[in-house]
């Protein structure tokens, strides 16, 4: 009888503890803790690498090869990315730039730091040029394909690149919020 009573008391304590934990988590008001801890003047940046299905890419053709942007966008879609309508010329801000020596240029803002690094893994480590624009709004990653592009990396190569990248550091002037 004493054992049964002890087991009942332990069970009630465990249930009470579980209820308290669930209520504490449910009523947590620290949803913006990361943003609040950014030093004044720093821009919050999402540095966590998302899954491919969470990333939207706009592919531009920086070469003279016909329909290259459409082909690369199709390849990215087959790897789980969402793509905007590909553009067969570089963005206006890059109109005077040569992409002759580039594999790809990846342009992203504070909302897409992790996404930009994820996309870079598809061009192997150090093959793509990463360009962070602190004033850029939105989470779309621009990919400008250069003359040195041959193909996207295989899944194994992507996994190796992601391992080499690790968790991206926040770019200068930003702080990580994830």
Regions from the PLM with identified roles:
Residues 1, 8-13, 71-73, 77-150:
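BRCT (BRCA1 C-terminal) domain core and associated BRCT-interaction motifs
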Residues 1-4, 41-44, 170-178:
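Short, charged N-terminal helix-start/capping segments
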Residues 7-23:
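Hydrophobic membrane-insertion alpha-helices, especially the h-region
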Residues 31-93:
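Extracytoplasmic low-complexity, Pro/Thr/Ser/Ala/Gly-rich segments
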């Amino acid at each position: 009888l004493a054992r049964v009573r002890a087991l009942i008391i332990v069970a009630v304590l465990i249930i009470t503890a579980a209820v308290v934990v669930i209520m504490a988590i449910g009523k947590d008001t620290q949803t913006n803790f990361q943003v609040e801890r950014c030093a004044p003047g720093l821009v919050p940046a999402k540095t966590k690498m998302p899954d491919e299905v969470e990333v939207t890419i706009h592919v531009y053709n920086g070469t003279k090869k016909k329909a290259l942007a459409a082909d690369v966008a199709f390849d990215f879609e087959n790897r789980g990315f969402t793509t905007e309508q590909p553009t067969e010329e570089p963005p206006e801000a890059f109109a005077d730039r040569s992409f002759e020596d580039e594999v790809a240029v990846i342009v992203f803002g504070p909302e897409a730091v992790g996404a930009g690094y994820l996309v870079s893994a598809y061009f192997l480590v150090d093959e793509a040029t990463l360009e962070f624009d602190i004033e850029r709004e939105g989470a779309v990653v621009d990919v400008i394909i250069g003359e040195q592009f041959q193909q996207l990396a295989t899944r194994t190569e992507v996994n190796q690149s992601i391992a080499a990248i690790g968790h991206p550091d926040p770019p200068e002037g930003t702080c990580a919020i994830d």
